């Protein structure tokens, strides 16, 4: 009888893949064995395969991702009669980590049905439920998760041991008799009664609840109750930053415009927050000045039960102090969230690691924040990087996330936040140690941002010194370039690409602050071809939060000082101009982000101070009309001059048309310069990256101006600094080889 050795690679551990193989094999009368190992899943089988190999890919379980099915003839004299799943142990241990997944339809039907899990908030199976958020160490089994304290009852044990059951080896398996417990507490005491019903009643009464979710606590309130929303804003001291919402699918159509692509994203097992056009049926204070709302579907049984009992739409925003990481522990929540929440919906299953909600857009598709449900999935490295050494890269100061390279794959870590916040810095250090231990990573090089004062850069330098391995400092926008190429699997020797990088800031090799760049390069190096005409950042970092400073210098440069004086009468203009003239705490910057701030300030959008990062630019995007003037921005000696945009203001153009002009003119100017490189044969393709390209209007316009060119964009990896570490790691790998 012919025997075969079948190797399956991808996300195939912890997703019910072995029982799936067992069922396929038994249905086809095959004999053999299936097991997990360090490379994925290994199948040793004898008999007529027929469509068996194709079915492994085509009929895989919902959470599986099959990257490769490799079939080779083999001699398998020791195969058992029938088909077996290898017992747990070194061979059978699950060594890959799967992201957390939203409740599957079968489990949802159970909690709404009449069986033993009716109304049970911790129902899960191999197709859904917690994974990364409960994992404490590898291999992945119950004893190494936060489910270890909960001994299985006989009924759960029987399901766990039955290969025909969808809970076969589901490590978080639980039921009301043996699993975690849910309760509501207020005033330091647990309240008697149905926790879900009590919580829903309090939400209907306008109270704010702290709700323990999958990767941390949320603060929840009735999204239709303007007083409750205002109270939450006052308590959190969060005057304008948009709140995320949670809604059942049947409630979506009345609050947002749901496209087929948005619905698909909402239903994805990652269950991200999806940005969609608002219908105007909810209080404007949910997202002041924004045309979109961020909405997610319930993604745990607890959320489904709560939304069913409440019967409406909830605000579901991170449970944290302003700027601090999301709270994950019960005692921590009682200590830190009591000033915000009237009551706590809590449980006794511990959260092993903090995971924020992921955030996506769908038009065009892009990940804005990569976290719960999307990590820790691995990414294949582009051709040419197969033998890259183990590298750790630490990203930047904002939207921090680290990246590991190992065995031809990259593992981009979860969103951590801004590293200038002390608690976020602690979380960063914990994540560094956590990932190194969890994935047995032993770096042979360390990559950091070129800016030596970034906390992550200093940390990386210290670690490289301790390990005695090379430290590779990567220019900020070169890292963005490489991250975009890497996501698109651009070969290491695939030729140079014209890359438009528009973002907030990054230290340039010339000592100025970059942020509006056209680069020509690859993983190994780059040259700067065009850039936004630099302007001083008056007050340094203060220019990032006070848009009038950027407006003042741009208006002055356009010969419109009188207009600046009229627009900003209360600002210390004379002092600011003196600092700019003398170059005192006023570094030159080509930042596109600060140009958006400047135009927004001129239009009266938070001119004196932004209440959160990106507020001015986001509100400007929402304001922009669909049509309007598109003034040409001259490019002289590589410097693109935005002065004509400010002339529109002086001419009295409508604010929405000025906002349109900024997007269209900036897109047109950089697209024209990129096109020249393509037409001259200097570049093989054009790429768009940097945080400004998370502005869907800017991204779409730039793509339209380059419609007949090969365009590389980022969809699965954040174009903002959340993807920076991947680019750093790839640049480091390329430089190590070339050296």
From Swiss-Prot:
Is Cytoplasm included in the keywords of this UniProt record?
A: no
Q: Which SUPFAM superfamilies match?
A: Acylphosphatase/BLUF domain-like, YrdC/RibB
Tell me where on the tree of life, at the top rank, the source sits: Bacteria
Q: Which GO terms describe its biological process?
A: protein maturation
Name its pathway. Protein modification; [NiFe] hydrogenase maturation
EC code(s) of this entry? 6.2.-.-
Which reaction equation describes what this protein catalyses?
A: C-terminal L-cysteinyl-[HypE protein] + carbamoyl phosphate + ATP + H2O = C-terminal S-carboxamide-L-cysteinyl-[HypE protein] + AMP + phosphate + diphosphate + H(+)
Q: Does the keyword Cytoplasm apply?
A: no
- UniProt keyword terms in alphabetical order: Ligase, Metal-binding, Zinc, Zinc-finger
Q: Provide a Gene Ontology MF annotation, just one.
A: carboxyl- or carbamoyltransferase activity
One matching Pfam family: zf-HYPF
- The YrdC-like domain covers which part of the protein? 193-373
Q: C4-type zinc finger positions in the chain?
A: 104-128, 153-178
Functional note? Involved in the maturation of [NiFe] hydrogenases. Along with HypE, it catalyzes the synthesis of the CN ligands of the active site iron of [NiFe]-hydrogenases. HypF functions as a carbamoyl transferase using carbamoylphosphate as a substrate and transferring the carboxamido moiety in an ATP-dependent reaction to the thiolate of the C-terminal cysteine of HypE yielding a protein-S-carboxamide.
User: What protein family does this chain belong to?
Assistant: Belongs to the carbamoyltransferase HypF family.
Name assigned to this protein: Carbamoyltransferase HypF
């Amino acid at each position: 009888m012919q025997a075969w050795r079948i190797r399956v690679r991808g996300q195939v551990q912890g997703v019910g893949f072995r029982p799936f193989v067992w069922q396929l094999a038994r249905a086809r009368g095959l004999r053999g064995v299936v097991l997990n190992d360090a490379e994925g899943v290994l199948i040793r089988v004898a008999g007529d395969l027929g469509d068996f190999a194709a079915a492994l890919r085509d009929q895989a379980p919902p959470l599986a991702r099959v990257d490769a099915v490799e079939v080779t003839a083999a001699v398998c004299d020791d195969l058992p009669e029938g088909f077996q799943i290898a017992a747990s142990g070194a061979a059978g241990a699950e060594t890959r980590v799967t992201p957390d997944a939203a409740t599957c339809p079968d489990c949802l039907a159970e909690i709404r049905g009449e069986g033993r899990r009716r109304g049970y908030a911790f129902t899960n199976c191999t197709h859904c439920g917690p994974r990364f958020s409960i994992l404490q160490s590898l291999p992945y089994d119950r004893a190494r998760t936060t489910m270890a304290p909960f001994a299985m009852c006989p009924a759960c044990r029987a399901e766990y041991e039955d290969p025909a059951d969808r809970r076969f080896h589901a490590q978080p398996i639980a039921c009301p008799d043996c699993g975690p417990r849910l309760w509501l507490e207020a005033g330091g005491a647990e309240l008697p009664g149905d926790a879900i019903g009590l919580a829903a009643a309090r939400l209907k009464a306008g109270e704010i609840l702290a709700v323990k979710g999958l990767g941390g606590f949320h603060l929840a309130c009735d999204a239709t109750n303007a007083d409750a929303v205002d109270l939450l804003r006052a308590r959190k001291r969060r005057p304008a930053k948009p709140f995320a919402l949670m809604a059942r699918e049947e409630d979506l159509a009345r609050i947002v415009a749901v496209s087929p692509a948005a619905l698909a994203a909402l239903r994805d097992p990652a269950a991200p927050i999806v940005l969609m056009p608002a219908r105007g049926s909810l209080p404007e204070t949910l997202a002041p000045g924004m045309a979109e709302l961020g909405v997610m579907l319930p993604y745990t049984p607890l959320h489904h039960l709560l939304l069913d009992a409440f019967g409406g739409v909830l605000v579901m925003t991170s449970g944290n102090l302003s700027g601090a990481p999301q709270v994950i522990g019960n005692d921590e929540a009682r200590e830190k969230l009591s000033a915000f929440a009237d009551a706590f919906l809590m449980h006794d299953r511990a959260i092993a690691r903090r995971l924020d909600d992921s955030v996506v857009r769908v038009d065009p598709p892009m990940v804005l924040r990569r976290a719960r449900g999307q990590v820790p999935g691995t990414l294949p490295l582009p051709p040419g990087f197969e033998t890259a050494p183990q590298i750790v890269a630490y990203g930047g100061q904002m939207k921090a996330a680290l990246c590991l390279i190992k065995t031809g794959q990259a593992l981009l870590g979860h969103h951590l936040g801004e590293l200038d916040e002390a608690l976020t810095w602690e979380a960063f250090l914990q994540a560094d140690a956590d990932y190194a231990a969890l994935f047995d990573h032993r770096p042979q090089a360390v990559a950091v941002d070129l800016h030596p004062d970034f906390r992550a850069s200093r940390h990386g330098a210290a670690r490289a010194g301790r390990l005695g391995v090379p430290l590779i400092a990567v220019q900020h926008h070169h890292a963005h370039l490489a991250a975009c190429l890497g996501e698109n699997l651009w070969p290491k020797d695939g030729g140079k690409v014209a890359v438009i990088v528009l973002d907030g800031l990054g230290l340039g090799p010339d000592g100025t602050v970059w942020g509006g760049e056209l680069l020509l390069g690859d993983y190994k190096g780059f040259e700067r071809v065009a850039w936004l005409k630099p302007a001083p950042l008056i007050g340094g970092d203060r220019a990032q939060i006070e848009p009038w400073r950027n407006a003042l210098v741009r208006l002055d440069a356009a010969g419109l000082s009188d207009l600046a004086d009229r627009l900003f009468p209360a600002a210390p203009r004379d002092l600011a101009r003196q600092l700019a003239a003398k170059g005192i705490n006023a570094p030159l910057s080509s930042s596109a982000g600060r140009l958006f701030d400047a135009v927004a300030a001129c239009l009266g959008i938070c001119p004196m101070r932004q209440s959160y990062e990106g507020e001015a630019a986001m509100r400007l995007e929402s304001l922009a009309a669909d049509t309007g003037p598109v003034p040409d921005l001259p490019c002289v000696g590589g410097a693109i001059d935005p002065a004509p945009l400010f002339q529109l203001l002086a001419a009295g153009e409508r604010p929405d048309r000025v906002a349109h002009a900024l997007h269209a003119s900036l897109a047109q100017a950089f697209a024209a310069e990129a096109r020249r490189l393509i037409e001259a044969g200097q570049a093989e393709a054009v790429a768009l990256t940097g945080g400004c390209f998370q502005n869907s209007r800017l991204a779409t316009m730039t793509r339209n101006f380059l419609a007949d060119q090969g365009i590389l964009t980022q969809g699965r990896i954040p174009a903002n600094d959340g993807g920076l570490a991947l680019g750093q790691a790839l640049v480091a790998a390329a430089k190590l080889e070339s050296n």
